[in-house]
Amino acid sequence: MSFNNTVAVAMSGGVDSSTVAAMLREEGYDLIGLTLQLWNQRRLAGKDGMPEPVQGRCCSIDDVYDARRVAETLGIPYYLVNEQERFESDVVRPFVSEYLHGRTPIPCSLCNNHLKFDQLLLRARQFGADRIATGHYARNEYDPARGRWILKRPADRSKDQTWFLFGLTQEQLSRTLFPLGGYTKPEVREIAATHKLALAAKPDSQEICFIPNGDYKRFIDAYLDEQGESIPDSAGELVSTTGEVLGRHAGIHNFTVGQRKGLGVTAPNPLYVLQIDPASHRVTVGSDTELATETFRARDCNWISIADLTGERRAQVKIRHRHEPAWATVRPVRGADGTAEAEITFDEPQRAVTPGQSAVFYDEDEVIGGGWIV
């Protein structure tokens, strides 16, 4: 497969994507800078106690300004593309719906799977580029023996973003460059400084791009109010693992598996959310040791290093962003509706396996695939 020399760089206004642009320009690529405008940061400000946008936070107008300034410094054309309507339908609405159904979603993975890479590649082609480049910490390469593109963990494990990228298709992987995969974050900042990028020391964003201060409960209230909707009544019982009713709660959207604070009940020892039943609205709580899970399932799996899961295999499985992958046996099964799922059994039970999060399967550095925890 041959590509032209033009690459569209996804520019977020941060140090990583800006450094990617500087590196590729130095390597002789013809570049186009693209920023996807995903959310109006002022849209819900002041509604139901939502704060004003914080200057310099992820996806803000300040980031757009920084991205444009870097493009001008490097002498590359720059375009801001409005994707707010699709972001709302493909990311924000599902995010809200998942919480209302007692699950804990990952908006970054939803965005990568359903919007960002599709739209970046579409826009890149419109501007004459065959490929895109992003500032993700990941690596990819083509394996001719398997005839597949492989996604691999980066050199800087502390910045590993492959957990968020498990949904990438072979086509997307073949047309994406991850120039930072072989570098550590301090090295990237040094490269940025070498290229005299003004934002070499700009702090990383640690929050969900469309939710100020990470207060998702307030966001859900404000968003539904704006839509003329209200939070469905999901009040119910807080129960122990033996079924004893310990109290009542105001709604299942207020909880996530593993949560300790804000349960509304007292006990001699700390209690944690073990399970959320969206049908009965029951929230089961228990001890930290009861939070461990040995076997669970994942749906809507995407396979990367293999074409499909046809039999039982060993893998290291990661169940949240900061979780160290743990050894497990993964086998294909059928869900209640007959669709394909993966059943995962850990060698050692793992803490807080959370519905709505993703389970990503690794073979050392390689991403085998991943799916959504049910």
Swiss-Prot record:
Signal peptide: none
Swiss-Prot/TrEMBL GO biological process terms: tRNA wobble position uridine thiolation
Pfam family, one: tRNA_Me_trans_M
Function according to Swiss-Prot or TrEMBL: Catalyzes the 2-thiolation of uridine at the wobble position (U34) of tRNA, leading to the formation of s(2)U34.
Protein's cellular compartments: Cytoplasm
Record: residues binding ATP: A10, M11, S12, G13, G14, V15, D16, S17, L36, G135
Protein name per its UniProtKB record: tRNA-specific 2-thiouridylase MnmA
Alphabetical list of InterPro entries matching this protein: MnmA-like (IPR004506), MnmA-like_C (IPR046885), MnmA-like_central (IPR046884), MnmA-like_central_sf (IPR023382), Rossmann-like_a/b/a_fold (IPR014729)
Region of interest called Interaction with tRNA, as start-end residue ranges on this chain: 159-161
Family to which the UniProt record says this protein belongs: Belongs to the MnmA/TRMU family.
EC number: 2.8.1.13
Residues that span the membrane, as ranges: none
Active site: C111, C209
GO molecular-function term, one example from the UniProt record: tRNA-uridine 2-sulfurtransferase activity
NCBIfam families per UniProt: PRK00143.1, trmU
Uppermost EC category: transferase
Disulfide bond residue pairs: C111-C209
Site residues, Interaction with tRNA: H136, Q357
GO cellular component assignments: cytoplasm
SUPFAM superfamilies: Adenine nucleotide alpha hydrolases-like
Reaction(s) catalysed (UniProt annotation): S-sulfanyl-L-cysteinyl-[protein] + uridine(34) in tRNA + AH2 + ATP = 2-thiouridine(34) in tRNA + L-cysteinyl-[protein] + A + AMP + diphosphate + H(+)
Keywords, sorted A to Z: ATP-binding, Cytoplasm, Disulfide bond, Nucleotide-binding, RNA-binding, Transferase, tRNA processing, tRNA-binding
Native organism: Acidobacterium capsulatum (strain ATCC 51196 / DSM 11244 / BCRC 80197 / JCM 7670 / NBRC 15755 / NCIMB 13165 / 161)
